[in-house]
Amino acid sequence: YARLNRVNLDGKGKIKMLTPEEGNHKVTFSPSGRYIIDTYSRPDQAPRNVVRDVSGKLLFTLERPDLNNLYAEGWREPECFTVKAADEETDLYGVMWKPMDFDSTKRYPVIAYVYPGPWTEYIPLDFEFSSPSGAPQLAQLGFVVVCFGNRGGSPYRGRDYHCYGYGNLRDYPLADNKYGLEQLIA
């Protein structure tokens, strides 16, 4: 997730995280530069809007969206999860969509949405009702839809993670996908 941090440019002192809540943060500074409007969410958490001062101190929370009508219709947010990559060491983060009428006693076909990169990976970081992948819509057709990051995707996880698929853009995500799916169904 993206967060806002502060650090001294002289190299002294420690990095201070100004937006500590778990979620993907999008910030806007006030014209004076003294305040921050912080909007953050996760795939499984509706957006929250807060106002902070530039030290990161929470000043107040703005009104939250009311999702009661969505829940009344049976809508459910996707589930976030963590699995291990095929190397059994690297954490892979993912999201799972289930049908609104999901019954844990039944079996469902699974669709794994694979796009590991290069440069990016498709894992929603923010709350959204629909998805460019069509995952929520496929879930309503009776599938469980899963997507998770693969080694070789995001550069924000470090050089080794990002460059894992170098020279093999076709096949490298398959081992991680297979191993991740096996963990989810175990």
Where do the language-model regions lie?
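Short secondary-structure boundary segments
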Residues: 1-9, 59-63
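Repetitive beta-architecture junctions, highlighting loop-to-beta-strand starts
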Residues: 2-4, 13, 47
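Short loop/turn segments that connect beta-strands within beta-propeller blades
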Residues: 8-12, 53-55
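A short beta-strand motif characteristic of beta-propeller blades
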Residues: 13-19
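Serine-hydrolase catalytic core recognition
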Residues: 26-186
